[in-house]
Amino acid sequence: MKSISKVEEVLEPISKIAEKIGLDEDEIELYGKYKAKISLDILKKKAQLQEGKVILVTSINPTPFGEGKTTTAIGLSMAINRLGFKSIVTLREPSLGPFLGLKGGATGGGASQILPSIDINLHFTGDIHAVTSANNLLCAAVDNHIYHGNRLGINPKSITIKRAMDMNDRSLRHIIVGLSNDQKGAIREDGFVISVASEVMAVLCLSMSYDDLKEKLGNILVGFTYDKKPVYAKDLNVHGSMALLLKDALKPNLVQTSENTAAIVHGGPFANIAHGTNSIVATKIAQKLSEYVVVEAGFGSDLGAEKFINIVARKSGIYPQAAVLVVTVKALKHHAKIEENSGLQSGVNSIQQGLENLEKHIENLKVMGLETVVALNKFPDDKDEEIELIRSFCEEMGVEFSVSSAYTHGSEGVLELAEKVIRLSDKRKRINFVYQDSDFIEEKIKKVATIIYGAKDVKFSKAALSKLELIKNLKVEHFPICMSKTQYSLSDDPKLLGKPKDFILNVTDIEIKNGAGFIVVMCGDIIAMPGLGKDFAALHLDIDSSGNPIFK
């Protein structure tokens, strides 16, 4: 067993990190020695300052264990600082579900981490707990309203919100609630989503102030009356108390990297289910405090990056000046369906199909108007000829290429990437949205499916078609769409690797997130409450007699 906290011996007091980016002691709230909340007043105080440039970090379709996007983003920010510029990396807060489930932590690794990593991966400053509480307060209020006479006439079968928990637990996906001895409540089907996939999390990440937060929470659609009129959270009068529960959660969290540069970690929406980027208030604050903000969008360009452009940028005016597309030899071989231990002497002749996946992601970023650097996250067993093949391919595609060794060497291993990103950020073209606000929802879905995924067409289920009619009736067709699908493929089938052609995207359901202001489009077998695998990560975590975490 080994300690997973030794790297944290380099930690500096968070007040010193705050000082480096121009924050006074009265502008942060300490959560212990190494974590702090940033005051929302910063945006008013720094209003006259020029906004820093935004660098968007994305990837190709990943393997189940990720491709080092977070490690690369952290290393890139550290490298930009090392070159003499001021940079802050902004990231999502890790969810306990993946940390204790399959993927493990989401704080980078090796010489390129955010710290204190174990605190961040566990309860951190309690933001996700607050989101869970606010979400479940709303759910409790709905059932309580029905129990006490149902003045609004809510149809229990029409309730659209689900309870939330920050844990992978498949047994809670579909449940029955309302069983009671007094038989006054409504027995109905319900379920749980993981907290980071809840609409409350999306609302938190898209809100800029307490008034904005409360308004969005009040607009959450909770269900319909028996005569099919919509019911919102504000009709139950709990949106104020929900906002109160989120009072501190709205403030971004300040931590540090393994080289003692600033990192703002705030919000945690999943990218395959939700919109997949840290809060806009965190990025806005980082822009006022630095010259370059490195933002990570979850999973590949087909998910996190697409949603950053079409949801986050559209709503916030935060436009990236350049993009970094993270790739690994391992992932390319995966997309070429080459097993890691297949006995092949070289993968040079066998990753061409994998390069097709990279090609599509490069095309996607070009479509969205982003100048791009492909960053190869280097592993020790990567062969020089494999790296050169990828380099040559990128040159043919007309994009920059750089090898990243942030995990091993920290900022020193990403200096070339940082230099190329800085240079490219001065060349930014106009951002292109994939669809327009005025497009019909069906048209928006088809544009993303055909342009970004490469689908031939889209097939809508009966449930999805009925929701399209509901969207028209509620007059929310102007909302952007939040595509919800597998992260492992450009299609909705996780087994369809590489660059699939002539496939049909299956839209199974559509959800109206009226508070967040977008439409969730469920594709394939996507599930909002993950389950644990047989050998899940929590089986390898422990604590010693001194309270130090250990990894087995």
Curated annotation (Swiss-Prot):
Enzyme Commission no: 6.3.4.3
TM spans (from-to): none
Family annotation (InterPro entries): Formate_THF_ligase (IPR000559), P-loop_NTPase (IPR027417)
Gene3D superfamilies in alphabetical order: Domain 2, N(10)-formyltetrahydrofolate synthetase, Formyltetrahydrofolate synthetase, domain 3, P-loop containing nucleotide triphosphate hydrolases
GO molecular function, one term: formate-tetrahydrofolate ligase activity
Pathway the protein acts in: One-carbon metabolism; tetrahydrofolate interconversion
Positions contributing to ATP binding: T63, P64, F65, G66, E67, G68, K69, T70
Disulfide bridge partners, by residue number: none
Key words of the record: ATP-binding, Ligase, Nucleotide-binding, One-carbon metabolism
Reaction catalysis annotation: (6S)-5,6,7,8-tetrahydrofolate + formate + ATP = (6R)-10-formyltetrahydrofolate + ADP + phosphate
BP terms from Gene Ontology: tetrahydrofolate interconversion
Keyword hit for Cell wall biogenesis/degradation: no
Homology family: Belongs to the formate--tetrahydrofolate ligase family.
Annotated NCBIfam families: PRK13505.1 (NF010030)
Protein name, as recorded: Formate--tetrahydrofolate ligase
Organism this protein belongs to: Caldicellulosiruptor bescii (strain ATCC BAA-1888 / DSM 6725 / KCTC 15123 / Z-1320) (Anaerocellum thermophilum)
